[in-house]
Amino acid sequence: MGKYFGTDGVRGEANVELTPELAFKLGRFGGYVLSQHETERPKVFVARDTRISGEMLESALIAGLLSVGIEVYKLGVLATPGVSYLVRTEKASAGVMISASHNPALDNGIKFFGNDGFKLADDQELEIEALLDAPEDTLPRPSAEGLGTLVDYPEGLRKYEKFLVTTGTDLSGMTVALDTANGAASVSARDVFLDLNAEIAVIGEKPNGLNINDGVGSTHPEQLQELVKETGADLGLAFDGDSDRLIAVDETGEIVDGDRIMFIIGKYLSEKGLLAHNTIVTTVMSNLGFHKALDKQGINKAITAVGDRYVVEEMRSSGYNLGGEQSGHVIIMDYNTTGDGQLTAIQLAKVMKETGKSLSELAAEVTIYPQKLVNIRVENSMKDRAMEVPAIANIIAKMEDEMAGNGRILVRPSGTEPLLRVMAEAPTDAEVDYYVDTIADVVRTEIGCDN
């Protein structure tokens, strides 16, 4: 990752780290880089989630885009995957989403999509960063008819909603509880599920600029669990702030995470011969129970580093059409180029409707192993070399021998902090505690910062 761009665009505390000045420059330089090869006036879609800082950053970003002659289509509040969809289908030069996803309201972010609807490649981000760090701005400054124009485009939301509905099936007789996280899905999820003829109950649908992801949404599903039980809903669906991820709740109030959602949809596609290469792409953090369920079903898996960016890269390079993360980012490439919480929710409900099975029945095929993750502060120079320390390598090997194939250990460095992450999965909580704590003690002794 670069100096400004992380794995999911540029992020920071709004008006402190991610300032209007930086947003203007990102619009100006990003717009220039992404439209250099256009033969006609470049067209860029811009959307945001419901954060109080969204309109401030949107105004600055759009000013930057207009300053290099871009025709800007202002979408207002819209889910991140909606931007990706519109860029592709309306043949835009690029798209920009202003959101910090599942982060709290004080944060915000800016991420770009190329004309293919995918997030930017590293070389494009580095080109933008080079312009940001240049001693002076030498880009063209058009005037009069050379300046960009701004078009309000509320039709974009309607087009995205119609697209979502076309991917589903009639949900008559099904009751769906929705948690739209006081975020981007609050403008669309209700309408989409009503159009699919579901009975609905909704929470997290009253954004005020400050309550996005606050006790609601995919990272806080507790209220949704209660709503499902209170209403007798067939399933609950929780989105995050920009609606690119989904966590579900079954009819008993139990959480159904990204691993189980991928398995349910993947098995359905596999049985219909529609799962490309009969493979699901997942990350190293997916639960061992998920892997065992895939093996039992005869479905292959491709494993990547943590981050939906890497999942998408593997899907594109190898021609896979389903992938995602335990956290609820699920990419269904037949329909869209990025994680799409509402799309995934519709596909999950479709599987339930077409199989006649409850969500708890479908999810029961994946036995989730207890998992524990411990972060250990270590010397930054050692976090990538931990396995070179004999005592650490030996204790990991010893624990894996004791597991005898009925558990999993993952030790990996943090990408952004001086931390070593120690994770284990095993059949019982007691076993997980034993494996993680034993390894963590050795790591602290050998390379921990407190020594």
Curated annotation (Swiss-Prot):
List the InterPro entries hit by this protein, alphabetically: A-D-PHexomutase_a/b/a-I, A-D-PHexomutase_a/b/a-I/II/III, A-D-PHexomutase_a/b/a-II, A-D-PHexomutase_a/b/a-III, A-D-PHexomutase_C, A-D-PHexomutase_C_sf, A-D-PHexomutase_CS, Alpha-D-phosphohexomutase_SF
Q: Which GO terms describe its cellular component?
A: cytosol
GO MF term list: magnesium ion binding; phosphoglucosamine mutase activity; phosphomannomutase activity
Q: Record's superkingdom?
A: Bacteria
Q: Name one GO biological process term.
A: carbohydrate metabolic process
Q: Which residues carry this modification: Phosphoserine?
A: S101
Q: Which UniProt keywords apply?
A: Isomerase, Magnesium, Metal-binding, Phosphoprotein
Q: What PTM annotation applies here?
A: Activated by phosphorylation.
Cofactor binding, note field: Binds 1 Mg(2+) ion per subunit.
- CDD domains documented for this protein: GlmM
Q: Where does Mg(2+) bind?
A: S101, D240, D242, D244
The coenzyme or cofactor needed here is:
Mg(2+)
Which sites are catalytic? S101 (phosphoserine intermediate)
Q: Which residues form a coiled coil?
A: none
This entry's Enzyme Commission designation comes to: 5.4.2.10
From the UniProt record, list the reaction(s) this protein catalyses. alpha-D-glucosamine 1-phosphate = D-glucosamine 6-phosphate
Identify the HAMAP family for this entry. GlmM_B (MF_01554_B)
- Extract the PANTHER family matched here: PHOSPHOGLUCOMUTASE (ALPHA-D-GLUCOSE-1,6-BISPHOSPHATE-DEPENDENT), PHOSPHOHEXOSE MUTASE
The family note in this entry says: Belongs to the phosphohexose mutase family.
Name of this chain's protein: Phosphoglucosamine mutase
Source organism of the structure? Streptococcus pyogenes serotype M5 (strain Manfredo)
This protein's encoding gene: glmM
